[in-house]
A protein has these predicted regions:
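Beta-lactam-recognizing serine transpeptidase/beta-lactamase-like catalytic domain environment
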Residues: 1-168
């Protein structure tokens, strides 16, 4: 439960759980720098509540991709790579010999039961394949050659002091 007397520790615990999936954490991508997203230091109890379902902290597209991949990998969070390896040039300037292969690096395993991970994965699947009005991803399944899943979301922007929400 939420410790109302110590909201800071409650938010910290929530964010630690999110970080297990790569949200608000470095992804481990093979670039010299990366953003960890935006996690405000000051917040209210209302912010804590909305953060619990994804409406307060802001994450990078790469963090969101890593989050989805972590769920797909049954909780195994893997560092993303931009390249498979580093190659030399051949005498004609083309692709030469492999100099360094980029190995898969597992960053962590999410602390979640197999049963609960299965529920999350089923929820992602139902976003595309469900039969209710909440099946917001149905159109992306048209013509699929492999089973796909998706995560719903709401992108919020603030322009000229007018808040806009875009549900996806």
């Amino acid at each position: 439960g939420v410790d109302l007397k110590n909201l800071d520790s409650s938010m910290e615990k929530l964010r630690e759980t999110f970080a297990e999936y790569g949200l608000g954490a470095k992804t481990g991508v093979d670039l010299p720098t990366e953003s960890q997203g935006y996690t405000p230091k000051e917040f209210t109890f209302a912010n804590y509540l909305t953060n619990a379902f994804g409406q307060f902290d802001n994450y990078t597209p790469l963090q969101l991709a890593q989050y989805a991949a972590t769920v797909a990998n049954n909780g195994k969070r893997v560092a993303p790579h931009l390249v498979e390896g580093i190659y030399a040039n051949d005498k004609n300037g083309g692709l030469g010999d492999l100099i360094e292969k980029k190995e898969t690096k597992v960053l962590n395993q999410v602390n979640i039961s197999e049963e609960n991970m299965k529920l999350i994965k089923e929820g992602f699947y139902q976003v595309v394949h469900g039969g209710s009005g909440f099946t917001t991803g149905r159109t992306i399944s048209q013509g699929e050659s492999v089973p796909i899943s998706a995560k719903t979301g709401t992108a919020e922007t603030l322009t000229k002091k007018i808040q806009q929400a875009n549900n996806t």
